[in-house]
C-alpha cells in the first residue's frame, strides 16, 4: 500500500503548500487586487465627476456665450440708435445752417440791391441836376444842388 502512503504524503505536501500560499502568497495578491480595484473605482468616479463637471462647464459656457451675444446685440442696437440720432441731429443742424446761409445770402443780396438802388438814385439825381444845369445854362450853388438832389431822391 504504497499508494496510500504516497497519497497521504502528497496530501500533506499539498495542504502545506495551500497553507503556505494562503498565509504568505495570497494576502499580498489580494491586497494588490483590492488596491487596484480601489484605484479603478476612484478613477471611474473621477472620470464621472470630470464628465459631469465638463457638462456643467459646457452649459455655463453656452449660457455665458448666449448672454454675451445678447449683450453684443444690445450694444449694437444702442450704437445704431445713437448713430441715427447723431445723423438726425447733423441733418437738422445742416438744414438750419442751410436756411441761415440762404437767409444771409438773401439779406446780403437785398442790402446790395438797396445800396445799388440808392447809388443809382444818386447818380440819376446828379445826372438830372447836370442836365438841368445845361438846360438852364448856369450853375446852381452847392447847397441848392444838394437840396434838389435830396428832393429827387425822395421822389424816386
From Swiss-Prot:
GO CC entries: plasma membrane; proton-transporting ATP synthase complex
Family matches, as SUPFAM superfamilies: F1F0 ATP synthase subunit B, membrane domain
Chief localisation class: membrane
Top-level taxon of the source organism: Bacteria
Keyword Metal-binding: no
Transmembrane segments: 11-31
Keyword Ribosomal protein: no
GO MF term set: proton-transporting ATP synthase activity, rotational mechanism; proton-transporting ATPase activity, rotational mechanism
Keywords: ATP synthesis, Cell inner membrane, Cell membrane, CF(0), Hydrogen ion transport, Ion transport, Membrane, Transmembrane, Transmembrane helix, Transport
Subcellular location, record wording: Cell inner membrane
Short name of any one Pfam family annotated for the protein: ATP-synt_B
Bilayer topology term: Single-pass membrane protein
Family: Belongs to the ATPase B chain family.
Task performed by this protein: F(1)F(0) ATP synthase produces ATP from ADP in the presence of a proton or sodium gradient. F-type ATPases consist of two structural domains, F(1) containing the extramembraneous catalytic core and F(0) containing the membrane proton channel, linked together by a central stalk and a peripheral stalk. During catalysis, ATP synthesis in the catalytic domain of F(1) is coupled via a rotary mechanism of the central stalk subunits to proton translocation. Component of the F(0) channel, it forms part of the peripheral stalk, linking F(1) to F(0).
Subunit organization: F-type ATPases have 2 components, F(1) - the catalytic core - and F(0) - the membrane proton channel. F(1) has five subunits: alpha(3), beta(3), gamma(1), delta(1), epsilon(1). F(0) has three main subunits: a(1), b(2) and c(10-14). The alpha and beta chains form an alternating ring which encloses part of the gamma chain. F(1) is attached to F(0) by a central stalk formed by the gamma and epsilon chains, while a peripheral stalk is formed by the delta and b chains.
Protein name (Swiss-Prot/TrEMBL): ATP synthase subunit b
Species for this entry: Haemophilus influenzae (strain PittGG)
Gene (UniProt): atpF
